[in-house]
């Protein structure tokens, strides 16, 4: 990219582009970072359920940890997106791909607790709003990440990598896989456009990997 820039500015010849070696870049080469199941529960339990902001944060954490919502999904969630009668939550994610996810009693009760006893009076139709005036929708996905990061530090958990809100999404997928869920099930819940995106989680299923690991001479299996 830098050499192309130099060539466009006539600082070097175009023929020099062919002298720059191509660096291999493998798709899905990295490992997804996730929290252990007990750490996810500690994270959720760190919220002060008697305080308004604690009710809000707990409901958000449960949506991230139980349904795999993205930070942007939380920001754009509106009151009319929740079908209380039938127990569904409507989410419009990446590329405006809409999905209907089951609303469990645990998550539903947490949201109700916030709406009835924690959410300030406001004309905004956003489910989750700022805890201080002006009471409007959260500004961006960054606000959700800050919220999760604060909960991680409050729970005394060492974060395994970069990112905060997405960490709970990875944790859910990894937990589902370890408990026997198929990649197709995980792909459906996480609303991946292709199951190929979900396949990266197969790398963290150590139990399954042990079953297919080939023995190496003079080296015992894991």
Give residue ranges: language-model regions.
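Conserved catalytic core of the tyrosine transesterase superfamily
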Residues: 1-222
């Amino acid at each position: 990219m830098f050499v192309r820039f130099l060539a466009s500015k006539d600082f070097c010849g175009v023929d020099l582009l062919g002298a720059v070696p191509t660096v291999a870049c493998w798709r899905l080469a990295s490992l997804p970072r996730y929290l252990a199941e007990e750490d996810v529960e500690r994270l959720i339990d760190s919220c002060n359920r008697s305080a308004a902001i604690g009710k809000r944060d707990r409901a958000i954490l449960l949506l991230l940890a139980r349904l795999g919502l993205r930070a942007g999904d939380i920001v754009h969630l509106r009151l009319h997106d929740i079908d209380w009668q039938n127990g569904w939550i409507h989410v419009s994610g990446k590329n405006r791909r809409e999905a209907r996810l089951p609303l469990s009693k645990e998550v539903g009760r947490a949201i109700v607790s916030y709406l009835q006893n924690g959410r300030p009076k406001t004309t905004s139709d956003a489910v989750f709003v700022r805890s201080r005036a002006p009471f409007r929708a959260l500004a961006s996905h960054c606000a959700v990440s800050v919220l999760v990061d604060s909960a991680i530090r409050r729970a005394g958990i060492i974060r395994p990598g970069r990112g905060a809100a997405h960490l709970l999404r990875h944790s859910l997928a990894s937990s589902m896989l370890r408990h026997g869920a198929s990649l197709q099930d995980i792909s459906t819940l996480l609303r991946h456009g292709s199951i190929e995106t979900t396949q990266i989680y197969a790398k963290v299923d150590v139990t399954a990997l042990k079953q297919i690991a080939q023995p190496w001479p003079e080296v015992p299996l894991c």
